Amino acid sequence: MPEIASLQLFKILSDETRLGIVLLLREMGELCVCDLCTALEQSQPKTSRHLAMLRESGLLLDRKQGKWVHYRLSPHIPSWAALVIEQAWLSQQDDVQAIARKLASANCSGSGKAVCI
């Protein structure tokens, strides 16, 4: 995986949906597509397109578990990029944590919901 360039990172994070995905994953560690759709109030196809772009850039990793696909931030993100993400998270920490609290009580992995989008 080639290292992400600064211009590429800022282009990726300039989109509100992609930034939201990255910040939620920074807060919660790992989430499935349906949880991200719920948290961001976006459709599954739109969320999946953004997840694909983030995965292709090397920022995210995914793993399949049955019919669910779970995403997390890659541990191989360059340190400078991780600092950018951390600063973005700090600037929106209260909002991200509020969304995370709501999601934690309703997510498919946290509540044992049998149906995932």
From Swiss-Prot:
It comes from the Bacteria. GO terms for biological process: response to arsenic-containing substance. Residues 1-92 form the HTH arsR-type domain. InterPro entries: ArsR-like_HTH (IPR011991), ArsR_HTH (IPR018334), HTH_ArsR_DNA-bd_dom (IPR001845), HTH_MetalResp_TranReg (IPR051081), WH-like_DNA-bd_sf (IPR036388), WH_DNA-bd_sf (IPR036390). Keywords: Arsenical resistance, DNA-binding, Plasmid, Repressor, Transcription, Transcription regulation. One of its GO terms (molecular function) is DNA binding. Signal peptide: none annotated. Residues 33-52 bind DNA. Pfam families: HTH_5 (PF01022). PANTHER family: ARSENICAL RESISTANCE OPERON REPRESSOR (PTHR33154:SF18), TRANSCRIPTIONAL REGULATOR, ARSR FAMILY (PTHR33154). Binds DNA as a homodimer. Transcriptional repressor for the ars operon. ArsR is a trans-acting regulatory protein which controls its own expression. The repressive effect of ArsR is alleviated by oxyions of +III oxidation state of arsenic, antimony, and bismuth, as well as arsenate (As(V)). NCBIfam families: HTH_metalloreg, PRK10141.1. This is Arsenical resistance operon repressor. The gene is arsR.
